[in-house]
Amino acid sequence: MVVVDSFAAGVVLHELRFDWLRGVRLAVLRLDLVDPELSGNKWFKLSHHLAAAHAAQAPGLISLGGAHSNHLHALAAAGQRFGLATVGLLRGTEQDTPTVRDLQRFGMRLHWLGYGGYRARHQPQFWDAWRALYPNYHCVPEGGGGLAGASGCVTLVAQIRARLGEIGWDDYEALWLAVGTGTTLAGLVIGEAGNHPVIGALAGPPAHAVPDNVRRLLDEAGRADAGYRLVDASRGGFGRFDGELARFILQAERD
């Protein structure tokens, strides 16, 4: 089983320099360079789930997501690479998207749950039928979440610290990240252990259950519910953007 450190070797800390950042030093942890198919935070969130499946000699992995799910994409790729069958429980009705085609190419078996069926994922007995259909498969929460997902992200703090010297830094003031479910943020808070604040920019409306999820993960990890804050960076819905944000992205890419 490939361990986290072998993937972390590809992590790069890249300092950005923009005119509008005069007086502020900003560096980005380039997790997109880790692996062509297991990139971003997805590998780190999956690493402990994969280790648990390996330890239990599970024949496969089963998880949930949408027709554009980066999580399911990484899970299917990991299953193919490490010899584990994969099953995806998808939101809505059957769709043909680039992500879905990749899932099929990686060998993932797909079940479309509709929207009502997908909402049932939070019910206590949701997994029972799927465990009966796929005995001994390791069930991975939506998005690679749970304490195992957060624990896999703890190592990111050490990766950042180990690379500060490469850009001439000896410390930093805070960690910022985009937040979907809060799993990665919880991992960073655990890893920081109060040394630096962690600020999460919400990709979805604040009404989503992110604060409750982070609080629960920190409780499970035995950590105080402190050392982080959330700011609303959403544009009316999960992952949406408006004209102002689109112009900013284009300008940043040009610069």
Located regions from the model:
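PLP-dependent amino-acid enzyme catalytic core
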Residues: 1-255
